[in-house]
């Protein structure tokens, strides 16, 4: 639904030389359409005023900037100085789009691992329960099952509110949203009214940005201190989660979840069993207890299901309904996706695990399902936290029977340097197989696997590309694995 608003209505406290109609708020000059207001603020590499002329040429009706302007950049004659503009962007976007987050039940999910799975599983559950639900996150934006990729885990603040408005206008009654630490630190969810906040876990990642774990955790905690929040769902099996839970505002409906009998947990999984069919457990919510049988693989998916159960409980869904819908949830693309496993072929699992903790969880979980060897194909992304490279190697060496080191997304970094960093983490580097060609590494792993082996292809999950030297080439781990399975099964299809 197209919107338009007088600039004087959007900025009633700012003196305007002339009033104009604004049809959108945009920070990217390349995305400006006629009638949009171009918001020019300082970015990581440049100031938006440097692109004001391009925005005007594309039909921008107004240029908004935060004073003082950089001395080396020209300011268009009609540009409007808005004091504190950056801090006001969320409120302005919320006002412009008619407060979309207040029209839907908003669930924000944060944590190092499990955000995408939890958001997708929660949206799937709510949809099955009859509530049209939108998603915003790594897999894109849209109503559940129809998300369009955007390239962001959490979009920039103007786009966040625009996408919430689109979901509202498309009929969404609820939104499950990934909220990254970057988003919380950079104000990308400013003025979004969350009803429920969910914490999955905190493990090493993004220290190239946050500096240390304390700052990383503090960024995550911001989601739980927001005005208007009604409920918090926290994983009490995580050490930081327990600290976070203890510090919650007493006015919040605090819901602790645990699969390890942590004290204070409202939602628990007990009597856990894992087999080649999936997982089963008894779901306890308060005094209620119901059996759950899920086709999902891996112990960490128990944690994801508990996060979903906690969020549904916060939304006043009955325990019996929660248990029933958990058993109907299907795997998420790129998250412990299963291929093969029949007709004499090994079980192949494609997963997004790209942090030390996620890799350890994936391997440990699959070890519980494995009848024979566990073969791991993994790499590390270029131009990202280098400290996790040897950590992931050590985990693969200890937890898997065979480790094949390959390229992930080298980006602009030398792949040989990345591999050398990884190999430093092996106690016996000579025991690791190095095959930098990712497709060849996947084929090698599957060809060497026996019928009772499990092959984990870790790191890229749902990504349909491999980024090398700044160029994204079409590449899909699951598609390559399916092709490699063909000689073993004649089918190469997912099961």
UniProtKB/Swiss-Prot annotation:
E.C. no: 6.3.2.13
Pfam family for this entry, one: Mur_ligase_M
SUPFAM superfamilies, per database record: MurD-like peptide ligases, catalytic domain, MurD-like peptide ligases, peptide-binding domain, MurE/MurF N-terminal domain
InterPro entries: Mur-like_cat_sf (IPR036565), Mur_ligase_C (IPR004101), Mur_ligase_C_dom_sf (IPR036615), Mur_ligase_cen (IPR013221), Mur_ligase_N (IPR000713), MurE/MurF_N (IPR035911), UDP-N-AcMur-Glu-dNH2Pim_ligase (IPR005761)
One function term, GO molecular function aspect: ATP binding
Entry-annotated residues carrying N6-carboxylysine: 220
Keyword annotations: ATP-binding, Cell cycle, Cell division, Cell shape, Cell wall biogenesis/degradation, Cytoplasm, Ligase, Magnesium, Nucleotide-binding, Peptidoglycan synthesis
Compartments, as annotated in UniProt: Cytoplasm
Chain residues that bind UDP-N-acetyl-alpha-D-muramoyl-L-alanyl-D-glutamate: 29, 153-154, 180, 186, 188
UniProt GO cellular component terms: cytoplasm
Catalytic activity field: UDP-N-acetyl-alpha-D-muramoyl-L-alanyl-D-glutamate + meso-2,6-diaminopimelate + ATP = UDP-N-acetyl-alpha-D-muramoyl-L-alanyl-gamma-D-glutamyl-meso-2,6-diaminopimelate + ADP + phosphate + H(+)
Family assignment from sequence similarity: Belongs to the MurCDEF family. MurE subfamily.
Function of the molecule: Catalyzes the addition of meso-diaminopimelic acid to the nucleotide precursor UDP-N-acetylmuramoyl-L-alanyl-D-glutamate (UMAG) in the biosynthesis of bacterial cell-wall peptidoglycan.
Protein name: UDP-N-acetylmuramoyl-L-alanyl-D-glutamate--2,6-diaminopimelate ligase
Native source species: Xanthomonas campestris pv. campestris (strain ATCC 33913 / DSM 3586 / NCPPB 528 / LMG 568 / P 25)
């Amino acid at each position: 639904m197209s919107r338009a608003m007088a600039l004087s209505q959007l900025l009633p406290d700012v003196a305007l030389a002339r009033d104009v109609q604004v049809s959108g708020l945009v920070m990217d000059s390349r995305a400006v359409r006629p009638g949009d207001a171009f918001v020019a603020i300082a970015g990581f590499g440049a100031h938006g005023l440097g692109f004001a002329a391009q925005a005007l040429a594309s039909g921008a009706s107004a240029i908004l900037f935060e004073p003082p302007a950089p001395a080396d950049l020209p300011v268009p004659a009609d540009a409007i100085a808005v004091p504190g503009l950056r801090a006001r962007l969320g409120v302005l976007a919320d006002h412009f789009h008619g407060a979309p987050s207040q029209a839907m039940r908003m669930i924000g999910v944060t944590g190092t691992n499990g955000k995408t799975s939890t958001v997708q599983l929660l949206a799937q559950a709510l949809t099955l329960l009859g509530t049209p639900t939108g998603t915003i996150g790594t897999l894109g934006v849209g109503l559940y099952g129809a998300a369009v990729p955007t390239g962001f885990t959490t979009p920039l603040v103007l786009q966040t509110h625009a996408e919430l408005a689109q979901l509202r206008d498309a009929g969404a009654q609820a939104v499950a949203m990934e909220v990254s630490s970057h988003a919380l630190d950079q104000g990308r969810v400013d003025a979004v009214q969350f009803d429920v906040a969910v914490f999955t876990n905190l493990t090493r990642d993004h220290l190239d940005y946050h500096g240390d774990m304390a700052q990383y955790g503090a960024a995550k905690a911001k989601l739980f201190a927001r005005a208007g929040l009604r409920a918090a769902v926290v994983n009490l099996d995580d050490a930081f989660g327990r600290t976070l839970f203890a510090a919650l505002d007493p006015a919040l409906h605090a819901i602790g979840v645990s699969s390890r009998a942590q004290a204070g947990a409202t939602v628990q999984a007990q009597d856990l069993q894992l087999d080649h069919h999936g997982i089963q457990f008894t779901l306890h919510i308060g005094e209620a207890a119901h059996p759950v049988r899920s086709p999902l693989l891996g112990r960490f998916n128990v944690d994801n299901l508990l996060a979903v159960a906690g969020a549904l409980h916060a939304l006043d869904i009955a325990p019996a309904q929660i248990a029933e819908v958990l058993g109907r949830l299907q795997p998420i693309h790129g998250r412990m996706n299963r291929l093969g496993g029949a007709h004499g072929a090994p079980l192949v699992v494609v997963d997004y695990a790209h942090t030390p903790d996620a890799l350890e969880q994936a391997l440990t979980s699959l070890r519980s399902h494995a009848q024979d060897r566990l073969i791991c194909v993994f790499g590390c992304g270029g131009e990202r936290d280098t400290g996790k490279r040897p950590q992931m190697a050590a985990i693969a060496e200890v937890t898997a029977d065979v480790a094949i080191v390959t390229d992930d997304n080298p980006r602009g970094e030398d792949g040989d340097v990345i591999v050398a960093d990884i190999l430093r983490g092996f106690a016996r580097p000579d025991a690791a197989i190095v095959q930098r060609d990712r497709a060849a590494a996947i084929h090698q792993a599957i060809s060497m696997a026996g019928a009772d082996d499990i092959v984990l292809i870790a790191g890229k999950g749902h990504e349909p590309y491999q980024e090398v030297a700044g160029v994204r080439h079409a590449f899909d781990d699951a598609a390559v694995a399916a092709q490699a399975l063909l000689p073993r099964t004649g089918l190469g299809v997912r099961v």
